Amino acid sequence: MRIMGLDLGDKKIGVALSDPMGWTAQGLDVIAVKGPPEASVERISELVRQYGVGKIVVGLPRNMNGSFGPRAERARAFAGCLAGALNLPVELWDERMTTLEAEKLLIEADLSRARRRQVIDKMAAVLILQSFLDSQGRPRREAGGKNPGGPEEP
């Protein structure tokens, strides 16, 4: 089952998708937000059908002290809208620092400022989804198909 990860922004929604086994996240799309984020449900629904998505993970913005602000309430409302419209499980996932981490990775990759602007939301969605996938304890396979023995210990 594929899992979709979403990074909600005021102007864009970054979209990431897991591989069918749920081990790795890849960037998929950036959806321009026209009106309230709920207006983007149609495009997300198309992607869900196209890729056979069985679950959606929505980034939940939290303040550094763990409290929730207005953006978190928007994320909760959007997650509820998605769950109702798509009849899929939707999970909220802590997204603290993902945009900063995405920016750092893109700078290290020597992407121009213009190119970073184009892909940062997608990269943040990848980081949110990969964090979720890693938390699920799915064993990773080494090259050659060998299983190293289960989830990695921190």
Curated annotation (Swiss-Prot):
One of its GO terms (molecular function) is nuclease activity. Gene3D superfamilies: YqgF/RNase H-like domain. GO terms for biological process: rRNA 5'-end processing. Its EC number is 3.1.-.-. Pfam families: RuvX. Keywords: Cytoplasm, Hydrolase, Nuclease, Ribosome biogenesis. It is an enzyme of class 3 (hydrolase). It is found in: Cytoplasm. SMART domains: YqgFc (SM00732). GO terms for cellular component: cytosol. The keyword Nuclease applies. Could be a nuclease involved in processing of the 5'-end of pre-16S rRNA. HAMAP family: Nuclease_YqgF. Belongs to the YqgF nuclease family. NCBIfam families: RNAse_H_YqgF (TIGR00250). This is Putative pre-16S rRNA nuclease.
